[in-house]
């Protein structure tokens, strides 16, 4: 029984999963907010990509957080193998896309800062840096969630 509880610690339907999903939603929302505050982000494809991916992560995380809340309240965690595979694949795809978006945005920000602010005002570049940092944190939580759920599937 103890191994099953450990295997399901971060799997869908557990309190650990709820914490991961809330963290994903918070960091993705913060990344989207910091990027969208400046209207200039439309000029760079990497920033548009980041906004698009964070816009996908937010509803995915919120939906799975609602499933986690329901599973915790009812006391019956969602352990259907087919659904777990879909969650793992969705997390995996979003984790890869989040990493790509955060990395490309960070690279563009670094390039803009190389020009000593001639292409990006310090106020906007600071916001873009915060947005990329929040996207990296969201990616980390999404990847962790994917690994926890994959571990649960493999342990069954």
UniProtKB/Swiss-Prot annotation:
Keywords: Cell membrane, Membrane, Transmembrane, Transmembrane helix
Pfam families according to UniProt: CASP_dom
Cross-referenced InterPro entries: CASP_dom, CASPL-5
GO CC entries: membrane; plasma membrane
Topology of this chain in the membrane: Multi-pass membrane protein
Transmembrane intervals: 22-42, 47-67, 82-102, 133-153
Principal location class: membrane
Stretches of the chain found on the membrane's Extracellular side: 43-46, 103-132
Positions in the Cytoplasmic compartment: 1-21, 68-81, 154-156
Keyword match Transmembrane helix: yes
Record's subunit section: Homodimer and heterodimers.
Family classification: Belongs to the Casparian strip membrane proteins (CASP) family.
Protein name: CASP-like protein 5C1
């Amino acid at each position: 029984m103890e191994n099953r509880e450990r295997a399901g610690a971060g799997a869908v339907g557990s309190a650990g999963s709820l914490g991961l999903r809330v963290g994903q939603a918070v960091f993705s929302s913060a990344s989207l907010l910091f990027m969208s505050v400046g209207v200039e982000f439309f000029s760079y494809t990497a920033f548009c990509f980041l906004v698009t991916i964070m816009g996908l992560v937010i509803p995915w995380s919120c939906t799975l957080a609602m499933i986690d809340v329901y599973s915790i309240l009812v006391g019956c965690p969602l352990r259907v193998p087919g659904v777990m595979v879909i969650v793992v694949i969705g997390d995996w795809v979003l984790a890869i896309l989040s990493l790509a978006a955060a990395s490309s945005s960070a690279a563009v920000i670094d390039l803009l800062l190389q020009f000593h602010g001639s292409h990006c005002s310090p106020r906007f570049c600071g916001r873009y840096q915060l947005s990329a940092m929040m996207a990296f944190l969201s990616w980390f939580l999404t990847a962790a969630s994917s690994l926890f759920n994959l571990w649960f599937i493999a342990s069954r």
